[in-house]
Amino acid sequence: MQQNMIIPSFWTGTAIIGLVACAYVSYQCLLSPLARFPGPFAAKLSKGWRAYKTANGQWHRKLVDLHRKYGHVVRIAPNELSVGDPSSFRKIYSPAEAGNGFNKAACYSVVQGNRPFDLTGERNEKVHSEQRKLVATAYSMSSMVHFESKVNVVIETVIHKLEARCRKTIDLGHWLQMWAFEPTRPLLNSLKPDVIGSVSFSQPFGYVESGDDEGVFKRIQNAMGSAAWLMHAGWLFRLHQKLIPICGNWLAVNDRNGYFFQVACREVSGRINRGGDDKDIIGQLLETQKIKPQLKDLDISFMMTSNVFAGSDSTSIAFQSIFYLLLTHPAAHDRLMRELREREEKGELSDPVSFQEAESWPYLQAIIYEAMRLYAPAAFVLDRVVPPEGMMIEDKFVPGNTVVGSSAWVIHRNPEIWGPDVDTFRPERWLDDSTFLIDKKGALQPFSFGPRNCLGRHLAYQEIKLALAKLVYHFDLELNPKCGDWDEQKNFTFWVKPPLWVNLHPVKS
């Protein structure tokens, strides 16, 4: 008798679950305010679809395919839209709109953790604006004048190391990554000093000198890769954080607010105790602190931690993509080298090449911009929350609290903006050439746009322009056949880059 009662209960429960599931699917596909926007069926039902696509490292390419299939606006989760045209991009990220409620989405809480001062993860626009004003001067274009000599020292070290490896095949990407890390000093007091290190702390890390990063890059990449998919599985991150006292830390993303932050605190404390008037980022922040005491020592430590995560990989991928594209396009490489010799003969280049000289070289600028168009350092969607009053996208109403965002990778690969040769490396599109009038060059946004754009973009451009000018001035490079295909690389907020094997030769006189 009891067994007979269990069977109907089972089928009743199954029927209820089935009805609820059907109702949910029907709502998301037919009745949801976002039902009018096209997208993959699975994406309409669960954020898990986006998390999975992110975790396999091909989300940036999947997004391009989706936009080419469905159009400018694609539904990528039950309450999320990806937007792929510049006008909507500017509407979402522009200064005028940012003050009206386009806050960062909840997924950024994974990045922020428990940090009260975090320009990357802070979701509230008002708080972010106040924090950014406190530190902006240290990252301004005017501050770059003080940093050029520090960047040059590291470049000269790289050149010296590469000269010892001439007429050999080397992984140029390895050296470029260590160089990108050096200028901001990767904050590691326990490591030997090098541009992130030199510019942030006036002490480099020593990676270029030793040729070994001592596992630090891998640790940063693990943290960034962990954050990439957890940002779309926030419930799992929150559950993990509550279980840390019982199970310990299993997520690499916590290194940003743990290991690296602790090291940053030691570094900042040591710098304060050491004193001096070094013209580096931390020195400028300490000067700001004198007139704006609300900037605490702890806040400076938070900023120094961000320097490592925001600066090292984005600059490195820009370096490596520039050289990869240059060496796989002989016509562009030959023109650059020809112009180099012409400018040298006219006395327009010195040794070492100055930032002003690199800045005034149009074709060198064109190569950099075109490479950053094809391999944008930040290839993921920058999620924002639509304000309560909602917004219009392509004559369609998007209700408040919907998550919307754009990816530079999608906008930079949009043939409506860049023309039918959108996937082709053509530096000429950045010069005065009527062939490329269709291009809307203002759509290039490798460092985002508006009040949330990358604070370190001026430093990144300075490093990239100086490094490219000086390396082609000193070396002849050719791609080795064993170099892998970069079109297959994966992205997890950082790029999984194959070795950049090149044959290195001293420059021909």
Swiss-Prot record:
Disulfide bonds: none
Keyword field contains Iron: yes
Pathway of action: Secondary metabolite biosynthesis
EC number: 1.-.-.-
Recorded topology in the membrane: Single-pass membrane protein
Subcellular location(s) per record: Membrane
Disruption phenotype: Reduces the production of heptelidic acid.
Family as reported in the entry's similarity comment: Belongs to the cytochrome P450 family.
Protein name: Cytochrome P450 monooxygenase hepC
